[in-house]
Curated annotation (Swiss-Prot):
Main location: endoplasmic reticulum
Keywords: Cell membrane, Disease variant, Endoplasmic reticulum, Hypotrichosis, Membrane, Transmembrane, Transmembrane helix
GO cellular component: endoplasmic reticulum; plasma membrane
Compartments where located: Endoplasmic reticulum; Cell membrane
Involvement in disease: Hypotrichosis 15: A form of hypotrichosis, a condition characterized by the presence of less than the normal amount of hair and abnormal hair follicles and shafts, which are thin and atrophic. The extent of scalp and body hair involvement can be very variable, within as well as between families. HYPT15 is an autosomal recessive form characterized by sparse to absent scalp and body hair. Eyebrows and eyelashes may be sparse or absent as well.
Membrane topology, from the record: Single-pass type I membrane protein
Signal peptide segment: none
Disordered, as annotated region: 1-37
Protein known as: TPA-induced transmembrane protein
Tissue specificity annotation: Detected predominantly in the skin, with strongest expression in the inner root sheath of the hair follicle.
Amino acid sequence: MDLAQPSQPVDELELSVLERQPEENTPLNGADKVFPSLDEEVPPAEANKESPWSSCNKNVVGRCKLWMIITSIFLGVITVIIIGLCLAAVTYVDEDENEILELSSNKTFFIMLKIPEECVAEEELPHLLTERLTDVYSTSPSLGRYFTSVEIVDFSGENATVTYDLQFGVPSDDENFMKYMMSEELVLGILLQDFRDQNIPGCESLGLDPTSLLLYE
């Protein structure tokens, strides 16, 4: 029997590292192309553009920037306007209010009030009415400048009426003034409106009925 011959040793494969040849680094079109690294940030295109507000941050005088100067001017104008309005309101003079009138004549009105039955026994009522009439006409925007005095002329418990004498100072020989400012409708209307706005304590129904007041010269 033939003995098996030993197998030939297998040749070991040698692995060699392939190195890039210099000519392989050259691109086909002949132009070198540089690829940015991942760690490098590509600046945005807008970064090269100047902001339209950048001029406001420029120093004009020392450390004062342009926006500071504009804001100061704006606030200064507003302050001047406010001060001017305040001074105008304080120094305003109403020519009509301060006009000195020559009230050389007197105008007399008699006003009679009918007292409700529940108020006849009120002893202080005539005094309260005197104070009320004085306050009404002395503080009236229309007649306050001309009002002089008010006095009780007659008080009748039986007829439940009280009559007052109203005195006003008026310019002489002024028909328009007497027609519009000292008309009976105006003098009586002021008192009626006051009774509607505020009643007499203890006699709430007094003056609410227009027929309970009579004005005559």
